[in-house]
């Protein structure tokens, strides 16, 4: 059983982990909100990085991290769909030996976000109403 003070410490430590991994986002003006963190369930989490012009949602499910980009209408779009629309194929990351897409690893998602942040901002704003 996890008591409240242990939960606060785990959440603080987890926040530090996210800020270390995705710290370039806070350097770029984003703030972090951890929506859920379940260390008892495979370490699953959901978190949102928010900036004035874009939101980025991270959802970790059994160590696979999915990244969605917030659109102006309140909907979310998979990062990979936006990248594919501008000619950056999902195949840039190979399949693992057991057939899983290697792009879902947390460190790969962080590198992708850092590399393609401007492209994602542009793609997300292109889908915003004027």
Each PLM stretch: what is its role?
Residues 2-21, 32-46, 50-130:
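Intrinsically disordered, low-complexity regulatory regions enriched in serine/threonine/proline
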């Amino acid at each position: 059983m996890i008591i409240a003070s242990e939960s606060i410490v785990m959440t603080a430590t987890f926040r530090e982990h996210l800020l270390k991994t995705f710290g370039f986002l806070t350097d770029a003006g984003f703030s972090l909100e951890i929506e859920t963190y379940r260390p008892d369930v495979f370490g699953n989490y959901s978190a949102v990085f928010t900036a004035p012009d874009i939101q980025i949602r991270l959802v970790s499910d059994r160590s696979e991290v999915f990244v969605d980009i917030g659109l102006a209408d309140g909907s979310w779009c998979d990062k990979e769909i936006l990248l594919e629309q501008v000619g950056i194929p999902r195949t840039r990351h190979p399949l693992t030996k057991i057939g899983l897409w290697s792009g879902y690893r947390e460190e790969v998602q962080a590198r992708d976000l850092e590399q393609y942040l401007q492209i994602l901002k542009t793609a997300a704003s292109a889908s915003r109403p004027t």
